[in-house]
A protein has these predicted regions:
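Hydrophobic alpha-helical transmembrane segments of multi-pass membrane transport proteins
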Residues: 18-22, 26, 52, 71-86, ...
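Helix-helix packing/entry segments at the starts of transmembrane helices
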Residues: 10, 97-102, 165-186, 226-262
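Transmembrane alpha-helical segments that form core, pore/gating elements
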Residues: 25-28, 49, 107-109, 144-203, ...
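Hydrophobic transmembrane alpha-helices of multi-pass small-molecule transport proteins
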Residues: 49, 71, 119-138, 271-292
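C-terminal-most transmembrane helix of multi-pass membrane proteins
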Residues: 2, 42, 214-216, 250-305
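C-terminal transmembrane-helix exit sites in multi-pass transporters
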Residues: 53-56, 103-125, 254-275
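Transmembrane alpha-helices of multi-pass small-molecule transport proteins
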Residues: 32-79, 102-107, 159-164, 179-199, ...
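Glycine-/small-residue-enriched transmembrane alpha-helix faces in small-molecule transporters
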Residues: 1-39, 75, 79, 83, ...
Length: 305
């Protein structure tokens, strides 16, 4: 029964990552600049979660200390998305994704530090292996050190908010967490707009209005590609290790490329490097549950002995 539940959880996780892979396509379809996009995405998401909470008749009441903790994580999420888009602007998509590949490696150190446990050697090794897999796929370009540095910061923030969400998921419902985090991310993005536009977009005018089908793509992005996967991911953190989730998340660009080819008919060819890099990541993702199970068995034997 436990194995069946775990397999189901991992299949759900892969489905969520497939949905997140679709966000890259939506990003191409939406005409809004990056931070305005983050603002509308989080605004729509927070309203959508509020509607779900209303129909489920769940409570939104939290103590002030709990509220500060959850909304603090929401600010980290907003900072992660902002630095992610900034990195892509400073460098290239491949450099940005190469930096983001370090998320699982950061998690291997942050999770034990936050939870006061020992660092697991195989998590560090798998984190490094996944980085090599993504470097093979995207063939990292040198000369973009500032963009890479910002991407590393974004990856650190992603690892940090994931680990903190793992702790919050033990005490609060996924919908409570998602609502307040999306609300905080939305408010922080709104406060950051003047600074972001002045520093990172050559002082362009803030673009509030959308065009053509932007409203539809924003609704899909905010509701289907954010509310559902974010809430379910928080729920999965109650049962799956945060490292395992972040390790599997490295398949998002792979799924995104495949979906882009299928849906948009992208001209990019699936090179041998793509298949080799994907294989490296897949092996890392698939071997982690085995190593984790082996580690738990070894500890159990030591305890009994």
């Amino acid at each position: 029964m436990w194995i069946q539940r775990t397999v189901k959880d991992y299949l759900t996780l892969h489905f969520i990552i497939l949905i997140w892979g679709f966000t890259a396509i939506l990003g191409l379809l939406i005409s809004l600049p990056s931070l305005e996009l983050v603002f509308y995405r989080t605004l729509i998401s927070s309203v959508g979660v509020a509607g779900l909470i209303y129909f489920k008749k769940e409570s939104l009441v939290l103590s002030s200390s709990q509220l500060v903790k959850i909304m603090g994580v929401g600010v980290l999420i907003s900072l992660h998305w902002i630095t992610f888009f900034w990195s892509a602007r400073l460098a290239t998509a491949s450099v940005c994704l190469a930096g983001m590949a370090t998320t699982s490696l950061w998690t291997a150190f942050i999770e034990p530090w936050v939870n006061r446990t020992k660092v697991k050697w195989y998590e560090v090794v798998l984190g490094v292996v996944v980085i090599s897999g993504l470097l093979v796929i995207f063939q990292f370009e040198s000369g973009y050190w500032l963009g890479l540095s910002v991407a590393l910061l974004s990856a650190f923030l992603a690892a940090l908010f994931s680990v903190l969400n793992g702790r919050l998921s033990k005490k609060h419902s996924p919908y409570q967490i998602t609502f307040y985090e999306m609300l905080a991310a939305c408010l922080f993005a709104l406060l950051m707009l003047p600074f972001y536009n002045g520093l990172m977009t050559d002082a362009q005018v803030i673009q509030w209005a959308w065009t053509d089908w932007d409203w539809l793509w924003l609704l899909i992005l905010g509701l289907i590609c954010t509310v559902y996967p974010f809430s379910v991911t928080v729920e999965l953190m109650q049962r799956l290790p945060v490292f395992s989730i972040n390790l599997t998340m490295n398949l998002e660009p792979v799924y995104g490329i495949v979906l882009a080819v299928i849906i948009l008919g992208e001209s990019e060819k699936m090179t041998p490097q793509f298949y080799l890099g994907t294989l490296i990541i897949l092996i890392s993702v698939l071997i982690y549950p085995v190593l984790n199970y082996w580690n738990k068995r070894r500890k159990a034997v030591r305890t009994l002995g």
